[in-house]
Amino acid sequence: MTRLALLACCLLFMTGCSSTRHVPQGEYLLDKSTITVEDAPEVQAKSLQNYLRQVPNHKVLGFARLQLGVYNMSGRDSSKWYNRWVRRLGEAPVIYDDALTEQSARQLRLAMINRGYSNVVIDIDTTVNAAKRKTRVNYRVRPGSPQVLRNVRYTITDTMLRRIVFDDTASISLKSGGLFDRNMLDAERSRLTALMRNNGYYTFAKEHITFIADTAAGSRDVDLELVLCAPKPAIPGDTAEATRHRRYFIRNVYINTEADAPASARLDTIMSRGYHIIYGPSRYLRPSILDEKCYLNSGQLYSATNVDRTYEALTQLGILKYVNIAFTPAGKMPDGDEMIDAHIMLSRGKTQGIMLELEGTNSEGDLGVGAGITYQHRNLAKHSELLTVKIRGSYESLSGNLEGLINNRYTEMGAEVGISFPKFEAPILKKRYRQRVKASTEFNFTFNHQERPEYTRIIAGAGMKYKWNNRMNTRRRTFDLIDINFVYLPKSTIDFINTIAPTNPLLRYSYEDHFIMRMGYTFYKTNRPPLFNTSAHNNISQPDIYTFRMQAEMAGNLLYLISNATGMKRHDGAYKVFGIQYAQY
């Protein structure tokens, strides 16, 4: 309760500072900016917020401008380092600017025109509070008459391309009755381009798709024609070559694990599962892991998605510094389609690393020292496994009255060993399923020995877990196959626990002997788009972001079944492991 009160006081102090403290005389703080859309219920005002060129300072919890409050805690003398430091922590006040307001209005008008509205008018309503030196701005959007698609026609002379397009009619977004939205036109162009490039058309580009819009004077109806153009010939005037788009098939896949090797280096090429793998003397990656991480295969129709998935899977391997994929022509097929060779170039990073930490302490004259070392091996068994070993120790002497205590010093020794595999370590899973997700398998072992004046405590643990995500990282799952936590206090003073945790059961439990062997599952889902999935139209509104997290676990049930089946004796009405009662829930 005391912490909440202290936090509330801090919030009141920061927000209580004058918000116009650093607003120059004659200027106004932009206090609020809103958008009102009239006579167009289908347009949400919040979808237009990204077009504003000036917005007020950010509010926390919808009412407190904490960052502005921090900035206002600084003095007016910007030559002092303290004032500059405080200002960097906060956010400068947003000063109302007529030019930016006009620019925002122009951007809103252009956005509405692109969405299919004509005769768009943007009115700016400004309310000035001279006493408080603040300004509020409201943009009133009057969309005018919407332009509606009356007819939509796809002109595709190539029968194979036409079949690909109309086999996926459910994804077509341009339909009669919809708005003549320029953003939707570009989205449809991008969708069709991706569709073609995933069906073998390696050289297909957005420029091969054009739109012809026919609008009658005085009418809001639009007849739209999408034209899928033939490719331009490499030789001007060669009409035979320009008759149709060519499909591309992968002839061979070459994986060069020594992309940085000099031309004089001795390299060997082996065939493994259809791949030409080029190795140096070390052969630092086994063929099996390359096979699992590669989505390109000989004889396969070119697919841009498979190229992206190969990039993502290979960059997951910590031993690799960078990955590059290129394609080269490899001749023609009898039917006129093309063949290409895939060249996957891998550059090796550092295999091992070590980090040392040192620290010294002085607590009321009691000197102490601590040291830690971390060792990493990024390719333990040539599958890009990550081995991490951490060892840490600390010591602090004690002075003064030590009567009634069991130790005359603070000491701590700990070790942690973790191994992470960049795939599912489960032989029953087929390659097809393992390639559908980004997965890892983790093992960890921990041990910590503590000596304090009041107690000696041993903490140990071990675990194995699986983690897997979908490609877009919007769904994440963690399955703790086993997680063991062991706490044992061989020595402690008589009233130690009652002294430190008289009313806190959780803190008390952490200082009592216990053994937990649990199994758990965690599911996480969000609609937040990944950072790399940015649209060409950054101002297109995104849906409200949500996250969902679910966790379930159980502990002790397997131990109980084993104890019951083997006839183990109960102690004080409960089963024990290593003389310690285990948790069950």
Task: Annotate the PLM regions.
Residues 117-122, 202-206, 367-371, 518, ...:
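Amphipathic hydrophobic-ligand
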